[in-house]
């Protein structure tokens, strides 16, 4: 299994959406077993609202993205013990065959 990580700036902003959708679609066609993970400042809830009016977002959520790390980075919630996230407000979502579920498996253990 291969993995592709998409992050930096805001990959799902209006200006980047065409290229991100094209890239994810092309990767899934050529390498269908590739898992795509994306970091976004948008919450999953915000993306679902946008998907009602944007077929690219809908396709990303329904077919192309495997994992979403959502929510803006917040300096006041910074926690270096978190896996894949910089601040505690961010959540990890993993797509099942029909929807995204919050991934509890990656929940960090509290250190004493």
Language model features: what each stretch is:
Residues 1-59:
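Conserved Radical SAM active-site core
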Residues 62, 66-112:
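Classical nucleotidyltransferase
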């Amino acid at each position: 299994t291969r993995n592709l990580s998409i992050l930096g700036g805001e990959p799902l902003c209006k200006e980047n959406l065409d290229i991100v959708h094209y890239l994810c679609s092309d990767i899934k066609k050529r390498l269908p077993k590739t898992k795509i993970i994306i970091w976004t400042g948008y919450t999953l809830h915000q993306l679902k609202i946008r998907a009602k009016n944007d077929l690219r977002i809908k396709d990303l959520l329904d077919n192309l993205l495997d994992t979403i790390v959502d929510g803006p980075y917040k300096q006041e919630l910074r926690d270096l013990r978190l896996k894949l996230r910089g601040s505690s407000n961010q959540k990890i979502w993993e797509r099942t065959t029909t929807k995204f579920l919050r991934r509890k498996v990656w929940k960090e253990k509290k250190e004493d």
